[in-house]
């Protein structure tokens, strides 16, 4: 017999099933929340920054943060950082923004109502700060108490006798007690004067030496130190010396380490100085604080008037890059001096790298007075002007660049440094054509000389004029991205019949030529698949582009044996992990 289910019973069963599903989902969510709170410390160590920030906030809010590191962070919020003498001391914990910055921001908020009471510096993820919070932080960081501390130094009264004061300062036993050992002073770019005049001295024969705030009175010092002080005729403690410091006394790296959240540590400290411009390449985690970083650098570096940050990669036919202004005036027309040579150009128009200064000096040491230097990638002409301007070099310059503005800056800088007569050739065009044309011109000169009549020398013998073909003495190809590809243009240059090395001029009758020394720059990485280091990779790259027929081993063997052309590799700089710029020199 079949039981008939009524409509009400059917609807009741459906409601019961739905309620069971909702109850199961709620229990699952509660279990996930409990697991999230319990696993917060573990996730905080291993998760990416965005996930880590979420779990840390949940842990702080719930109180279930069991990790020792984060428990210390919670317990230190709002605590005082003063010693027994009520002397404010800097906080040097691995968590530099945990308690000191928090309590300081509360004091700062009372004076600046626009600043939120909860310190914006406590946020682990800067991307979650509002625009108002970031603007307030940039506006009020100079008033932060952590950057304007008052330190009260103790002192000793020292008699002025001979070299007594210098002996105390140099004593290894007494140096730990001097004010110069204070941790805060290690973060300053100004030197504190620890020897002061003693105004209470009756006869003016005594001075004060400032001591570390934690230095105990004379009677509490170790016996050997007391005896040493008696030998130096130090018998009494001097007055305490309250000293006020401001943010202007500290280095930019210290200021940023105190202001930036832990999540974006370490703070950016490396930048390139180009005239009045500080050029940064900020990481993604520093991007939300870019204006704060720019203001700090502008305030702490006296010669800097503009702070810019590179946006994107170096690209385009002229190897330029976009940048954004972080602080200061919007002016990228810079003036700088290198080894007495004045350079002026606009960073927005040309490529410039101050880190190549040492490499330019190395090249200059290889130049001889009166030589001809060819630079197919001259840029604004720093190397060209140095070679032409320095009295001990006085070289003749053949220069070329693809960027018309770079060529114009070189022409103006040559006129500014009074070496325009040394710039014999200056053109704007393709570097391959520039190199190839020099070789073709020498072939034409050789053909012209071969048609001339023989002349008689002083011995009465008929000879053909053998004036060397005038190729440059040095060719500098500083364009690491593609310079080796232009080596094929050298195949248009005359090759001397003799391959013996040891002289820049190789004789061979009509074909006598001056053999240039080529300096070609390239990027290189080690190749573990072929067991070659970066230098071997660079040598093979140069050989393969100079003699493209055959494999690289064949090319290298042909250059070494047939042409007696040994490539010497010099490291220039690191540009990325495992990636370097190398300079290959050969004749």
From Swiss-Prot:
InterPro entries: MeTrfase_TRM5/TYW2, SAM-dependent_MTases_sf, TRM5-TYW2-like_MTfase, TRM5/TYW2-like_N, tRNA_Gua_MeTrfase_euk. Signal peptide: none annotated. It is found in: Mitochondrion matrix; Nucleus; Cytoplasm. Keywords: Cytoplasm, Methyltransferase, Mitochondrion, Nucleus, S-adenosyl-L-methionine, Transferase, tRNA processing. It comes from the Eukaryota. CDD domains: AdoMet_MTases. It catalyses: guanosine(37) in tRNA + S-adenosyl-L-methionine = N(1)-methylguanosine(37) in tRNA + S-adenosyl-L-homocysteine + H(+). Monomer. This is tRNA (guanine(37)-N(1))-methyltransferase 2.
